[in-house]
Amino acid sequence: MARSLVIVGAGPAGMSAAIAAQARGARVTVVDEAARPGGQIYRQAHPALKGGDFAEASERARKERLIGAFERVLERIDYRTETSAFALFKTGELHIASGSRTEVLRADAIILTTGVREIAVPFPGWTTPGVMYAGGAQALLKSQSVLAGRRIVVCGTGPLPIVVAAQILRAGGSVAALAMLNSLKVGGWQLPALWSGRELVREGLRYLATVIRARVPRLTSYVPVRVNGREQVESVVLARVDRRGVVIPRTEREVACDVVAVNYGFTANNELAAMAGIAMHHDPPRGGWLPVVDEFGHTSVAGIFAAGDAAGLRGALVAEAEGQAVGAAAAADSKEIARPDFRAGLAVALAARERLSAFQSAMQQLLLVPSGLWHLPTDETIICRCENVTLAALRDALTAGYLAPNTIKRVTRAGMGWCGGRTCLQAVSALAELHGAPSAAMMTPRPLARPIPLASLANRAAAGRS
């Protein structure tokens, strides 16, 4: 009998896994929160809206190829759009919600391809309307062809701020400044790894060329330290920092703008994996707390797999290659996987994953957040937006000896709000470390892993499934 699979997420890893598993005869269900496939990197506009694609031609070609291949198998799989997976248990029960209805899915295998989210570093004024993630500004362009503002300052680390600044310019927007925390200079020892990802390097250089041609002011080793404006962003103050992330005195520059788009790297969407009791390990450059997996995505819980950025930040190309390998493994039994011809059939995907992972490892040095940045917030700065927990309240708890994330959550309510700690967890953990907490600790995830309508739970209870 064909094996049944549920894949959570329809980004590059999820789509690739679905294609590979269906090709091996598996009965595949794909659950995704978006209305169309693609994930964050290959985000498409909602069918009722018109979005724009301001990416490089080579990236658009990869997107069209993979989404096209996924759409060709849609008639043979169960594809659940606009559906949230909000709980997963080691028994293999996956709880999902769509509209005002909930359902429990069970399958021979579950593949988590839940991706990553952006890291927030609080600073005075970061909750002012007009301050947003750089990825959020990019999502507006991709999904609706909407510019986030009239005059945008893009800040952060790694390649994404450059990409977002270039795409804003290509969409006809105005970038008032591009402030980068880290230099893009690399050492000679990294050249072989960069060569392995030369297609991505070329794309990055073309994005940078767009910014240079537009004569956008570019600042290196600068970060936003304060936003001015009560009801809306009016300007941002940028300051230079040293290698530790500590602000250098008398280096402040004020830039007039109505939007500040910030990215300080990414952390894995690991709530479902942790909730299921999967063994986790801590690897900050690759996304923080990650499930322990083998080369075919097996986790410590039988029948649950992880692939793509959810198993370690390595980008869309690695996610696609890994999704193919993990999808094939999840559709097979242990005897099939042990056969030499199984690995031989995946040789191209496994080689691509290894080659491109080397490139991403070289890039990860650009995504590290230096400890000095966590000193940017003042006592009045809100750390947990959902519960309005300020740095002063958090510091009182830390000074009293409450250093474990779960204890901080109970004492201050930081992480108890609508987002479940997804926005503030990095900041809370980093600030706790400054007070002597262990460097590797995480909040215990609880259902609901994603916000869902109360009507969904009410309807479930009314049907006798409390």
Regions found by a protein language model. Name each.
Residues 1-412, 417-418, 422-466:
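Residues forming the flavin
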